[in-house]
Amino acid sequence: DIESCDRVGLIQAMPAGDAEKDVFDRRWEQRLELMKEAIIYNRNNPSIIFYESGNRGVSREHMLQMKAIRDEFDPHGGRASGSREMLNINEAEYGGEMLYINKSKKHPMWSMEYHRDEGLRKYWDEQSYPYHKEGDGPLYRGKPAFEYNHNMDTFAASMVERWFEYWQERPGTGKRVSDGGTKIIFSDTNTHHRGEANYRSSGVTDAMRIPKDAFFAHQVMWNGWVSPEKDATYIVGHWNYKPGTIKQTEYVVSTGDEVELFINGKSLGMGERSNQWLFTWKNVPFEAGKIEAVAYTYDKSDKKSKDAKTKKETSRYAIETAGEPHHIKLTSIQNPEGFKADGADMALIQVEVVDKQGRRCPLDNRTIHFNYQGEMEWIGGLATPNEETQKALAAKNQSLVVDKNETAEQKAARKAAD
């Protein structure tokens, strides 16, 4: 993981064990020993910026001990030594709560687990099969868990809302600022969960790395350094509803100052803007064809009047209604260096149901049966309670399965049929 972050330029906080609290006696001694060994092993990895003393605050005395280890074994690395919380301990070189907006004029303050909401990729919205009601799911600690059972439209919108809270307190906006936060999960994974599935679904991709709408929403917001540097627009969801459907809410994420929505060339007007990048339309009538969002940005450089502004189109995005399912498309996602028949390499097989023009059919949920030939092992796909390993539900009409090859002597072939 550390080398992967080095390669793509993701900054990291390196922990030294954790008990969700400050500890004492031999347990604290073990944490000090682990921090020493971790620093020695990882101090030449450039993606590590922070040395984390604990996932909860530690005492001033313990903070000084951790800093002493850093000073001895990595005196010139430029890393900050701190911990979660630590708002009241001046010796900590960084801090921040788990979820909230903390600001400081001295130390970096960032949230350690921002946006813990969950949502399964198979749930588009309330008006699409399988018609999952927003927030519907099992109780968590005896209470409704709405925020852990999102549909993908509201999940993407909540991502925009949450990131805006950090962005508006970003560096450069005053003397006391927030330095942002770390997304708790990038891809759905087998960690502590609160939603209906047996794994955490807070990711912007599912566990097989298929993007959710929230992934593309982040591409719009994170298209640059602190603020987007390139204009972009994205329509959340699909455009395949039953005739006569009135879509309750249409979301668009855009860097524009205004966004105009068109259905088959007819304007539905400008969307209501919120949270900097989110634009919303209510009660949108479905009409098969093309839905398109056009973003405009104001030019305030007109020197004739302080209030003068002209708008120009800066980006657009469109979705077409997919036709009837026509065929299944398989795409192998392999090692960038090529598939190695060494008995250990794996291939992700992306499975899509598409129409005659190759457009993905978003609502076809028939079962797909898989067969394979050759020396390979079926590892499976997304974790579900169903233990049948030869079938996969075409959730939102796009799935991934994993194959592991057995020997270097035989080629393997896979076939899928509905």
Q: Residue spans of the language-model regions?
A:
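Beta-strand-rich structural segments
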Residues: 250-253, 294, 345-361
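Edge beta-strands of extracellular beta-sandwich domains
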Residues: 302-324
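Exposed aromatic-hydrophobic patches
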Residues: 278-284
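Short beta-strand segments within Ig-like beta-sandwich modules, predominantly Fibronectin type-III
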Residues: 269-275
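Substrate-binding/catalytic cleft of secreted carbohydrate-active enzymes
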Residues: 1-214, 218, 227-240, 244, ...
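Extracellular Ig-like/FN3 beta-sandwich strand-entry sites
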Residues: 286-290, 344-346
